[in-house]
A protein has these predicted regions:
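N-terminal, charged low-complexity regulatory/assembly segments
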Residues: 1-48
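A short, structure-level motif marking secondary-structure boundaries and short turns
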Residues: 29-30, 129-132, 187
């Protein structure tokens, strides 16, 4: 209980010096596993750094995000219908980002038979981590993007993030797509899942 109280105090302290304009309840990025949950996990990490592990933080984020994707296990990104529907969801997400100015997002035009591509050039969670010297734990929060896509019979191909570059890139294709052969996955020295 004392640890939880410290985490809550740290969370309130960190947020008091940061943005309060992230779109409120209507912003899907503020839902379960979203921006504020990431900041809460970072607050936990600050308080419990000596006794927690990278994997524990990664599991916390997975426990927040993955239940929603598990409910969508019928989605198969290998099928054009689902790929097109995912693309439309990303275009809709971009319109929200344009309204809230939290994540700056661009979505490439849809091409039949090709992977979906979008990117964030601004990420509040990454900005928060950079500002507070917490970039070492960001891979544990970002890697869930790979796991969530895998639950949709999709694969994420990523080469950079807003934490260590100027954008967070998302190339998404079906898990059987030949495109993947040219982009093997690996973990970099910081712990980020990436692709070549």
């Amino acid at each position: 209980e004392a640890v939880w109280e410290q985490v809550q105090l740290r969370y309130a302290e960190l947020l008091s010096k940061w943005r309060t304009d992230l779109g409120g309840k209507k912003n899907f990025h503020n839902g379960v596993g979203g921006t504020y949950d990431c900041i809460a996990i970072m607050s936990y990490y600050v308080v419990c750094k000596a006794i927690t592990s990278f994997r524990e933080i990664e599991e916390m984020e997975e426990n927040l995000i993955l239940p929603t994707f598990r409910k969508l296990k019928f989605v198969d990104c290998n099928k054009p219908f689902w790929r097109k529907l995912m693309y439309r969801a990303f275009v809709r997400a971009k319109s929200g980002c344009d309204k809230w100015h939290d994540y700056e997002m661009s979505v490439a035009p849809y091409e039949n038979g090709k992977p979906i591509y979008y990117e964030f050039t601004s990420c509040p969670a990454a900005e928060f981590a950079i500002r507070h010297g917490l970039t070492d734990i960001m891979p544990a929060l970002c890697n869930v993007d790979y796991a969530s896509m895998e639950l949709l019979h999709a694969k994420l191909v990523r080469t950079t993030t807003c934490v260590d570059g100027c954008r967070c890139d998302y190339t998404i294709c079906g898990d059987k797509d030949p495109y993947l052969k040219g982009h093997p996955e690996y973990r970099d020295e910081a712990g980020f899942r990436r692709n070549r």
